[in-house]
Amino acid sequence: MHSMNCRSRRLPIAAVVVCLAVGCATAPYTKRSQFIVVPESYETSLGVDAYRQVLGKEKITHDPKFVDPVREVGQRIAKAADKPDYRWEFNVIDDPKTANAFALPGGKIAVYTGLFPIAHDSAGLAAVLGHEVGHALAHHAGERMSQNLAVQVLGTGLSVGLGGQSSETQSAIMQAFGLGAQVGVLLPFSRTQEAEADHIGLILMAKAGYDPHAALDLWKRFAKMEKKSPPEYLSTHPNYDTREQNISGWLPEAMGYYRADPAISVQALPEIGAPGSRAASAEPR
């Protein structure tokens, strides 16, 4: 019996080791090693389904003054991403109180109208969309799904290993494991991914013909809007000081890709008034 328990405890860990061996990927531009075991086709199908659900619930605007700049800039960024198997899609959600944007797997992007005042112009919009396309290009959703799977497998192994403990002890240890996994594994990965999306986005906007310095200006505007930030170690995003330092450090690299495009003229975005009650979530995901 003791031998069986030992084997049971080892199996989940062995499974993770196997996954690590076969699930290695490399993020574009940053060359960061990634643990991804979720197939890209599955990740994309989930993204497409989720995107349709979101668009079905939200108020989508077809007003060209909002849609045209998003799609024009978005397609330039998508072309720079050089991912032709993605069916890139850019839509605008009519919600002036939400200053946000999001990316789902497969190249499905949405921007809330509340982001327009902070983006300010097409260069600022390029910084936002570069960030979102960066998430999609680096398969961050698939990476998070793979990471969650690994945590579940390790949690299963821990619960098997606690078989001889009292129920109270098992419960306390499993709760501590859950908190430790979130603070020690899941959230730091999210910060890593957010920083990586900034890095990749900076390069993409430069390749698309937009001055990457506009990204630094964008995050300074966000910082002014959100004067209070959660402590960085409990945040899923880098704080603004860290973000600005990172971007400043990456600018020389991004400028190596930048070639001013005479076909691009930076245009002011339509004014809709300042974002309102949802400022706490006002930051591209």
Whereabouts are the PLM-identified features?
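A Zn2+-metalloprotease active-site environment signal
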Residues: 6, 11-12, 24-285
